[in-house]
Amino acid sequence: YLEHQQEESLSRINKREAELLVLQLQVYIENISKERVLEEQIDFGVISPYKAQVYYLRSLIKRNAFFKPFRKLITIHTVDGFQGQERDVILISLVRANEAGQIGFLSDLRRMNVAITRARMKLIIIGDASTLSHHPFYRKLYQYIQEKGKVIQLGDSTEQEQTETENNSI
């Protein structure tokens, strides 16, 4: 699940993480029921700090027939694109996954504050704990979520993990 840098734009992308996020979104919609999502107009936001990841996530959603009835309810943007907006459910793809523990502009905590405060009911964060734990903020966030029993380990060799926090349950 390692990240890659786009040559032409210098943006970062983690395709496996994006694919995992899309799968988690589909499972989440199935769990609360497609009918309920449509009837109650439950809206979803997908946030990533990197444009390359945003473009890839958009292409995955667009190509997946499952999401066709929900496309108007799903917004995918960078952190800056979500400023001032909220959604019922937010999924965040942090992208960074490398052995050096480099997190780039994820270290800008103002941006992270924007990302993690956009959810009205549920927040799901997908990221590589071993990379992110090099930074004190992410280490504390991970520990907090772990104490709440909301960390889901995916069990692959890079220890990529999905962390989930609930504001309210849907």
Named regions from a protein language model:
Residues 1-59:
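Conserved helicase/translocase motor-coupling segment
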Residues 45, 62-78:
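Conserved RecA-like helicase motor-core motifs
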Residues 56-67, 144:
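Alpha-helical structural signal in soluble globular domains
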Residues 18-22, 54, 76, 89, ...:
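Amphipathic alpha-helical transducer elements in NTP-driven molecular machines
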Residues 61, 101-170:
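Helicase C-terminal subdomain and adjacent C-terminal extension
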Residues 77, 81-97, 113-114, 122-126:
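A short beta-strand element within the Helicase C-terminal
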Residues 51-54, 82-83, 96-99, 129-133:
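Conserved nucleotide-binding/hydrolysis micro-motifs of P-loop NTPases
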